[in-house]
Amino acid sequence: MAAAQVISNSGHEDMIHDAGLDYYGRRLATCSSDKTIKVFEIEGEAHRLVETLKGHEGAVWCVAWAHPKFGTILASSSYDGKVLIWREQHQNTTSPAAGSAWTKVFDFSLHTASVNMVSWAPHESGCLLGCASSDGHVSVLEFQDNSWTHQIFHAHGMGVNSISWAPAAAPGSLISANPGPGQQRRFVTGGSDNLLKIWDYNPETKTYNLSQTLEGHSDWVRDVAWSPSILSKSYIASASQDKTVRIWTSDASNPGQWTSQQLEFDSVLWRVSWSPSGNILAVSGGDNKVSLWKENLKGQWEKVKDIEE
């Protein structure tokens, strides 16, 4: 098993809130209450700070890399209510020493409160970024024909904490004799109203519409994560301030029906994250531990590992 790499000298002057590796695992972006984003190059056990991005006026909560087919693009969201899109531009020069430079290519500032999370859609759906804000609204930014467009709509009355996109292919489409209509644009949001909401894109009206509300948590939903698996079932994990994780399951044969299994913990929970294959769930919370969970043959979720700091 690969050993964890620790970057102890991040250069940030305050708490780090998020860190994300790019598609290839060669770049790491971090963000902090010091209002900056730092980009590191990772090579084996070594790391090197290559850029510090400044543009936010408050703590930066979240960073997210776009798929490389759209270029080297990084999104960030902040307490200042802004979403910034950054792009690495290679210098137009014959000198190999000239390298590249990061520039801010889009500044989205229509939210009226903190933007808590940003999430890129699967690349098959296009260059789409979902944004969750404490103002109760969700926005979806789209890059097309060299320009950015946006939609913004109300989602949760007490604020939106998290957002996660469904896989572009519907569950069961790989193994179905009669596959569905191809690409889907769906995402789930988690709110301070204790609810999860699933949103579907209507290509005729070009709007995102509420298709399902999932109830079960008794406190704020801090994070949601839609599993990337496209086998026979859809899985959504949600982490809550009520010290539980719920794993919601929907079968391809009955896509509107969701059932949930509850995992109980001793502390408030902050984040849930699926493995790339979508079969292992990582959970982290206020006890500084990460636990890994997997579904057994009986359909029950079991803890397979604890990772302590």
Swiss-Prot record:
Keyword Nucleus part of the UniProt annotation: yes
GO MF terms, alphabetically ordered: structural molecule activity
Disulfide bonds: none
GO biological process, alphabetically ordered: COPII-coated vesicle budding; ERAD pathway; mRNA transport; nuclear pore localization; positive regulation of DNA-templated transcription; positive regulation of ER to Golgi vesicle-mediated transport; positive regulation of protein exit from endoplasmic reticulum; positive regulation of TORC1 signaling
UniProt xrefs under Pfam families: WD40 (PF00400)
Topology relative to the membrane: Peripheral membrane protein
Keywords: Cytoplasmic vesicle, Endoplasmic reticulum, ER-Golgi transport, Membrane, mRNA transport, Nuclear pore complex, Nucleus, Protein transport, Repeat, Translocation, Transport, WD repeat
Localization annotation: Cytoplasmic vesicle, COPII-coated vesicle membrane; Endoplasmic reticulum membrane; Nucleus, Nuclear pore complex
Superkingdom classification of source: Eukaryota
GO cellular component, one term: COPII vesicle coat
Entry-linked PROSITE patterns: WD_REPEATS_2 (PS50082), WD_REPEATS_REGION (PS50294)
WD repeat coordinates: 11-50, 55-96, 110-151, 155-209, 216-258, 264-303
The UniProt record lists the keyword Nucleus: yes
Subunit structure as annotated in this protein's UniProt entry: The COPII coat is composed of at least 5 proteins: the sec23/24 complex, the sec13/31 complex, and the protein sar1. Component of the nuclear pore complex (NPC). NPC constitutes the exclusive means of nucleocytoplasmic transport. NPCs allow the passive diffusion of ions and small molecules and the active, nuclear transport receptor-mediated bidirectional transport of macromolecules such as proteins, RNAs, ribonucleoparticles (RNPs), and ribosomal subunits across the nuclear envelope. Due to its 8-fold rotational symmetry, all subunits are present with 8 copies or multiples thereof.
Function: Component of the coat protein complex II (COPII) which promotes the formation of transport vesicles from the endoplasmic reticulum (ER). The coat has two main functions, the physical deformation of the endoplasmic reticulum membrane into vesicles and the selection of cargo molecules. It also functions as a component of the nuclear pore complex (NPC). NPC components, collectively referred to as nucleoporins (NUPs), can play the role of both NPC structural components and of docking or interaction partners for transiently associated nuclear transport factors.
Family statement drawn from the similarity comment of this UniProt entry: Belongs to the WD repeat SEC13 family.
Protein's recorded name: Protein transport protein sec13
